[in-house]
């Protein structure tokens, strides 16, 4: 890996420290309940952080209909059809992602129903290398997570409620997008599948 390439993970870490951590651990009441952000998207500011959900919940964001809504909102918040994600973490009750939006990084905390719970803009502008390695939203399959979970249930007895979260990422070797699935019971073991959810296999 060349020196410039090393900048990308460092940038991701810096952005996560700036906005991602705060969004993932947001607590406490909000003053207003509903407002609109600069992209015209409704921001849900209820009395506290949304409840965590299990994978089998009807509103689980692992479901294609929920993930499709979230991806559409991310496109509106970002740079339209060409929006890329520097990070993308999908849990049954939330999505935490950092996307590019017309020359800036935007940290999003999305909840079921295609709603934004929190949004912040990073002062760090996207570098060319960061954008090259980021994952285009159009490559994320809304049916991938559910397909992956169904396959793991059949092969390994893993149920939707066993799922802690998934990460959409670009494989550093093949340069192809993939899903990494982590379980609640074992943080050291994860499963990898193609971005469409096909061919899941255990890693570590």
Predicted regions, residues:
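Predominantly extracellular/lumenal beta-strand repeat domains
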Residues: 51, 55-58, 62, 70, ...
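Positively charged n-region of N-terminal signal peptides that target proteins for export
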Residues: 1-5
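Exposed beta-strand-loop-beta-strand "reactive/processing" segments of non-cytosolic proteins
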Residues: 73-108, 167-193
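Hydrophobic membrane-insertion alpha-helices, especially the h-region
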Residues: 6-22
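Long, charged/polar, surface-exposed segments that mediate recognition or autoinhibition
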Residues: 114-162
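A short, surface-exposed beta-strand/turn
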Residues: 107-125, 188-204
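N-terminal low-complexity, Pro/Thr/Ser-rich intrinsically disordered segments
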Residues: 35-77
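Hydrophobic single-pass membrane-insertion segments
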Residues: 20-33
